[in-house]
Amino acid sequence: MAGGRGARASLHLHLAWLCAFATTAWAHGGGGGGGDSDADADGGGEGKPDLRARGLVAAKLWCLAVVFAGTLAGGVSPYFMRWNDAFLALGTQFAGGVFLGTAMMHFLADANETFADLLPGTAYPFAFMLACAGYVLTMLADCAISFVVARGGGRTEPAAAAGAGLEEGKLSSTNGNASDPPAADAAAQDHSVASMLRNASTLGDSVLLIAALCFHSVFEGIAIGVAETKADAWKALWTISLHKIFAAIAMGIALLRMLPDRPFLSCFGYAFAFAVSSPVGVGIGIVIDATTQGRVADWIFAVSMGLATGIFIYVSINHLLSKGYTPLRPVAADTPAGRLLAVVLGVAVIAVVMIWDT
């Protein structure tokens, strides 16, 4: 039995890595052929992209649909199937490496280059300053979440904390059985998606929590919406989808154990709220590109990419790498070395991708 589980875990992990590399190739191959100049550029001498080109807008709309459908499917999937813990644990670390590499090598580089073109006589590091601002803004959203949880903690029953055990994937129960008291006590301190929604004592608290939790997802979507080429849009899509889908799966697993009444409706409702945030950001980015052009569009792009850098770094470090998916029962593949390898692989994928992006 143990050997069979190990084989299945190994198969899932190999499939995950193959899918990641295939998606990378697809992101660049589908990003635009050499003859699709009407979508990626306006044909001017400077080679400036046409942000209102029909092909570019269509690609962004496809990205909107894919990230919404993928996140929603991931959120409700635990209701229909059982996910492998090793796949989720290492896959989340892989997504963290991808997020970190994308922020540092793609978004920050693009923002810095655009600011250099906009302000050639200024040496001030605007891109890096905005990255810090994005990091702090995301931390502020997390502080708002912590405030709501702390305010509602005194009004919730002690038993409510026993169901909370996810920190981007940390489970406090297995196969429907309650966890041990120490695990439940530790889970009470978690500020995770599922546990915080579970402890929200009023509808207003729940709405505020969902808004705060989806704050960075909206800016992630804006990174797709303001992309200058189809290749950039598809690349941002698969980067964001990795994080969103893994987080949605982990949230769905915890909700099934914490909310036994009408579990499918609970999973669908929370997954829908989590899934719709990034498409909202994509829509905002599309509207920005549709109403601006030239120098104004460059400023918006530079500021958006700078803020997105800080948000991606915060999500990578504080939500994916430091917390990740931690199953209650030990998993053979979930070791420090395994997690390091997954993170290095995620960063390496972006490093290789950037060879064709420079």
Swiss-Prot record:
Spans traversing the lipid bilayer: 61-81, 87-107, 128-148, 207-227, 236-256, 268-288, 297-317, 336-356
Presence of keyword Membrane: yes
GO biological process, one term: zinc ion transmembrane transport
Cytoplasmic side: 82-86, 149-206, 257-267, 318-335
Pfam family, one: Zip
GO molecular function: zinc ion transmembrane transporter activity
Source taxon at top rank: Eukaryota
Annotated membrane topology: Multi-pass membrane protein
Extracellular topology ranges: 28-60, 108-127, 228-235, 289-296, 357-358
Keywords from the UniProt entry: Cell membrane, Glycoprotein, Ion transport, Membrane, Signal, Transmembrane, Transmembrane helix, Transport, Zinc, Zinc transport
Compartment(s) of residence: Cell membrane
Entry GO CC: membrane; plasma membrane
InterPro entries per UniProt: ZIP (IPR003689)
Functional note: Zinc transporter that may be involved in zinc uptake from the rhizosphere.
Family affiliation: Belongs to the ZIP transporter (TC 2.A.5) family.
PANTHER family xref list: ZINC TRANSPORTER 11, ZINC/IRON TRANSPORTER
Name of the protein: Zinc transporter 2
Organism: Oryza sativa subsp. japonica (Rice)
